[in-house]
Amino acid sequence: ADTIVAVELDSYPNTDIGDPNYPHISIADENSLHFSFHKFSQNPKDLIL
């Protein structure tokens, strides 16, 4: 499979380039340039699995 997926944990809003104005996880399919954004909590206790 030649699918390339990038995942980014982003807490800085780059609104000038289309980033959401909230902490988020970006998931990008680099071959088709489709992006999805998902909110996340910045509370470390919420990150414990």
Curated annotation (Swiss-Prot):
Single Gene Ontology MF annotation: D-mannose binding
Post-translational modification: The beta and gamma chains are produced by partial proteolytic processing of the lectin alpha chain by an asparaginyl endopeptidase. Mixture of 60% alpha lectin and 40% of its beta and gamma proteolytic fragments.
Alphabetic keyword roster: Calcium, Lectin, Manganese, Mannose-binding
Free-text tissue specificity from the UniProt record: Seed.
Family: Belongs to the leguminous lectin family.
Subunit structure: Homotetramer.
More details: Binds one manganese (or another transition metal) ion and one calcium ion. The metal ions are essential for the saccharide-binding and cell-agglutinating activities.
General function of this protein: D-mannose/D-glucose-binding lectin.
UniProt name for this protein: Lectin alpha chain
Organism per entry: Dioclea violacea
Top-level taxonomy: Eukaryota, Viridiplantae, Streptophyta, Embryophyta, Tracheophyta
